A protein has these predicted regions:
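A conserved donor-nucleotide-binding helix/loop in the catalytic core
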Residues: 13
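Conserved mixed alpha/beta core segments that line enzyme active sites in large multi-domain catalysts
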Residues: 20-180
Length: 180
């Protein structure tokens, strides 16, 4: 498997890489957990990465890996299929061309990366057949650029209206330390 991963890193297109990941099977023990999750969460989901390199001090990877949004459906089996594909897609995105280019530009090695996948309930309002989140945010346990009385260990939060594109793209956000 490790040899195949290295080969994928070198030559395969994003679509080929994604197809390999989509063929993989998630552990059976997760299926029951996901059905229980669907019984509790009745709104769209964001399926995101949470990785060591995303919290890197000097070259954070926030926004580099794919995030998938899936709608809430009454059909739990279709929800399971979409969730399964989204989880695999997040993991596959580590090996995508843009991710590899950023990794190389920041002198990181793919073997250093460790990743979990986060399932987040999207909180917002429905307008017709569309669903809009109210706010998005990024919270960091360390604040690398404290201002005034802030301390690095107090963390930092950036909030924006709607989806998190403003945050990832460096747009105007509300920045605050939870301690102040």
């Amino acid at each position: 498997i490790a040899r195949r991963q290295r080969q994928m890193c070198i030559r395969d297109s994003d679509d080929v890489i994604l197809r390999y990941f989509l063929k993989a099977k998630l552990p059976d023990r997760l299926v029951e957990d996901f059905f229980t999750f669907f019984d509790v969460v009745k709104s769209p989901l964001a399926i995101r990465s949470s990785s060591l390199l995303e919290d890197s001090h000097y070259q954070p990877f926030a926004g580099i890996y794919n995030t998938y949004m899936i709608p809430y459906l009454d059909d739990k089996y279709e929800m399971l299929r979409m969730l399964s594909d989204a989880i695999k897609g997040v993991y596959a995105s580590v090996y995508f061309r843009d991710s590899k280019a950023y990794m190389q530009a920041t002198s990181n090695v793919i073997d250093q990366e460790k990743m979990a996948v986060i399932l987040q309930e999207v909180v917002g309002n429905q307008y017709g057949d569309r669903y809009y989140p109210s706010m998005s945010g990024v919270a960091r346990s360390l604040n690398y650029y404290p201002i005034g009385d802030e301390k690095a260990e107090e963390g930092i939060v950036n909030l924006a209206l709607g989806l998190g594109k403003y945050i990832v793209d460096g747009g105007m956000t509300l920045r605050f330390s939870p301690y102040h």
